[in-house]
């Protein structure tokens, strides 16, 4: 994946094949299955195949691993949304690609990490929360920039309200949508766009 390779080269996320990357990957699986509090450093070390003490060459404390999982997931999401609309000309397609990008964030490779971000938010310190919120605000600002720039063309009356409705509905899809069902992410993005703009679906959007 080009986005991942670029972020690794820029030092914004860990190489999944590196010791640090393997720790993050295995920890995310354990945190998702057992929860942050119930996962021990020994559990993580065993999953990675290293001694417990070796973890501390890469992370000072267990919470730093949790923060890294969340931080790297948000960075991937930011890069993905920016790439999604790059070169897109029409307002409708820009919004559709943003919706599609967010669905990919929820249901794609970053899905587990984004779920951890929500479920384990209270497990990190206030200072770490502030850093993550700064990253998250970057993501949201991009959304609002696209919506505001295209509000007239898309006949959007309230940009803030639309973003909140989209954010809530897209996030909730994690409870009912399955990738192996009858509707793929492209079709789901078409449905969400039609609902957001109160437009009838085009024939090609029908599964």
Locate the predicted segments by residue.
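N-terminal intrinsically disordered/low-complexity leader segments
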Residues: 1-18, 25, 29, 88, ...
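Amphipathic alpha-helical packing segments from all-alpha helical-bundle domains
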Residues: 75-78, 116, 126-152, 160-164, ...
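Amphipathic alpha-helical segments used for helix-helix packing
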Residues: 94, 107-127, 144, 175
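Amphipathic alpha-helical interaction segments
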Residues: 22, 93-97, 101, 116, ...
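C-terminal peripheral helix-coil segments that are non-catalytic and often amphipathic
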Residues: 1-7, 104-108, 140-149, 160, ...
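Helix-turn-helix
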Residues: 11, 22, 26-64, 68
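Hydrophobic alpha-helical connector segments
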Residues: 68, 82-112, 162
């Amino acid at each position: 994946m080009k986005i991942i390779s670029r972020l690794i080269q820029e030092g914004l996320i860990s190489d999944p094949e590196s010791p640090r990357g393997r720790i993050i990957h295995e920890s995310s699986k354990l945190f998702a299955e057992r929860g942050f509090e119930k996962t021990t450093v020994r559990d993580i070390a065993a999953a990675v195949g290293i001694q417990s003490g070796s973890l501390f060459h890469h992370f000072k404390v267990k919470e730093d691993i949790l923060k890294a999982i969340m931080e790297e997931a948000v960075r991937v999401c930011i890069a993905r949304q920016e790439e999604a609309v790059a070169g897109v000309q029409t307002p409708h397609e820009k919004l559709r690609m943003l919706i599609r990008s967010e669905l990919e964030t929820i249901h794609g490779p970053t899905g587990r990490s984004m779920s951890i971000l929500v479920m384990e938010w209270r497990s990190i310190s206030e200072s770490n929360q502030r850093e993550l919120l700064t990253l998250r605000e970057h993501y949201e600002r991009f959304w609002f920039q696209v919506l505001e720039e295209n509000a007239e063309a898309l006949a959007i009356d309230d940009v803030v309200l639309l973003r909140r409705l989209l954010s809530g509905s897209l996030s909730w899809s994690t409870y009912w949508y399955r990738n192996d069902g009858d509707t793929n992410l492209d079709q789901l993005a078409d449905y969400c766009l039609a609902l957001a703009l109160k437009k009838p679906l085009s024939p090609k959007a029908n599964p």
